[in-house]
Amino acid sequence: MAELPGPFLCGALLGFLCLSGLAVEVKVPTEPLSTPLGKTAELTCTYSTSVGDSFALEWSFVQPGKPISESHPILYFTNGHLYPTGSKSKRVSLLQNPPTVGVATLKLTDVHPSDTGTYLCQVNNPPDFYTNGLGLINLTVLVPPSNPLCSQSGQTSVGGSTALRCSSSEGAPKPVYNWVRLGTFPTPSPGSMVQDEVSGQLILTNLSLTSSGTYRCVATNQMGSASCELTLSVTEPSQGRVAGALIGVLLGVLLLSVAAFCLVRFQKERGKKPKETYGGSDLREDAIAPGISEHTCMRADSSKGFLERPSSASTVTTTKSKLPMVV
């Protein structure tokens, strides 16, 4: 008995399996799919198999940059029933329900930026395991650029360099950036400017007074454009020094004013302290003792050869002591 060649036997076996419905084949588009923000995306998926009681369809989703093993289901069809699940459950459905005639296309309404990623269409129909029943579709939600933010850094004096930056927080595909100068002033020469359309940065070198003006950044992708503006003012270096000196003088005047205020306040507080007073019973060094008259003092002094009157006419004198004399 002649033996059949190996390749012929494999081909015959494959044909038999296909005819008998023992092979599951899933077909999806090879090109990525793009859908504008807010529209409905149709993710086409077809299959070939003999649908039986064990037929099951599953759609799942994985975010960009993550492995397929981290995908999570968004829709099931099994035992004749459809089960949407996950955060997209209210926006997913099947183009044909039940999907039992070879069409398993998924509809996703009101697409969001977070819907961008890879979608997996998987058909299971035990015991049909001969081929891979899995198809992958990459979806990108197209989003126009958001209003960009313009900023500036660096020295803006004559001869200096500065960098103008522009960036949009949203936009898919990623927008490109272009800087233009407004008005009738000439655009800086290419030798004094470097522009990066990807990062949105414009570097201006060797600034001059004519570099002053309003610059506009335009962010653009296939969904639209948005812009922001920035005014650049280039100054003479001396103006910067004068401004610094003026600020220093103002600070010095402020410090002197504070010091003068503190000194006046201190003097006022010091003047409020109470002065010492003398009571009626206090004796002065030049007062005349009770019982001694002014004439007695004069006779005593005359014995020494001179007369001396009290230093003050207001000195109280007593001619007769009211105190008893002790002999």
From Swiss-Prot:
- State a GO cellular component annotated for this protein: plasma membrane
Sequence ranges on the Extracellular membrane side: 24-243
Q: Which GO terms describe its biological process?
A: lipid metabolic process
* Signal peptide interval: 1-23
Where it sits in the cell: the answer is: Membrane
**Residue positions with a glycan:** N138, N206
Q: Does the keyword Magnesium apply?
A: no
Q: Which UniProt keywords apply?
A: Disulfide bond, Glycoprotein, Immunoglobulin domain, Lipid metabolism, Membrane, Repeat, Signal, Transmembrane, Transmembrane helix
Disulphide-bridged cysteine pairs: C45-C121, C166-C217
Q: How does it sit in the membrane?
A: Single-pass type I membrane protein
Region annotation (Disordered) maps to 305-327
Tissue specificity, per the record, is: Highly expressed in stomach, colon, prostate, trachea and thyroid glands and weakly in bladder and lung.
PANTHER family per record: V-SET AND IMMUNOGLOBULIN DOMAIN-CONTAINING PROTEIN 2 (PTHR45046:SF1)
Q: What is this protein called?
A: V-set and immunoglobulin domain-containing protein 2
Taxonomic source organism? Homo sapiens
Task: Name the gene.
Answer: VSIG2
